[in-house]
């Protein structure tokens, strides 16, 4: 399942992202964060981390450096 999400992220980064203005307020970018999450954690944990990160991407959040957590133990 992780491989499917990684392919979707790859396609987004190669086919869609180049046509969108740069707007990510975080480092690493949300797509890179999601890629790292799916390379590190089981798909269900990576999915939750990615959704939470993307939900913070709005004008009222300051953004900045927000790396992937080293461990994720949410039950």
Swiss-Prot record:
Location in the cell reads: Cell inner membrane
Source species, domain of life: Bacteria
Single GO cellular component annotation?
plasma membrane
What kind of membrane protein is this, topologically? Peripheral membrane protein
Q: Which InterPro entries match?
A: Membr_insert_effic_factor_YidD
Which keywords does this chain's UniProt record carry? Cell inner membrane, Cell membrane, Membrane
Using the UniProt record, give the first listed, main subcellular location: membrane
Q: What does this protein do?
A: Could be involved in insertion of integral membrane proteins into the membrane.
Q: What family does the Swiss-Prot or TrEMBL record give for this protein?
A: Belongs to the UPF0161 family.
Question: What is the name of the protein in this document?
Answer: Putative membrane protein insertion efficiency factor
| Gene source species | Leptospira biflexa serovar Patoc (strain Patoc 1 / ATCC 23582 / Paris)
């Amino acid at each position: 399942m992780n491989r499917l999400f990684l392919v979707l992220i790859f396609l987004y980064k190669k086919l869609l992202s180049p046509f969108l203005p740069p707007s990510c307020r975080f480092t690493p970018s949300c797509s890179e964060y999601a890629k790292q999450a799916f390379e590190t954690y089981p798909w269900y944990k990576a999915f939750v981390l990615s959704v939470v990160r993307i939900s913070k991407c709005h004008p009222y959040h300051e953004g900045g450096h927000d790396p992937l957590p080293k461990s994720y133990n949410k039950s």
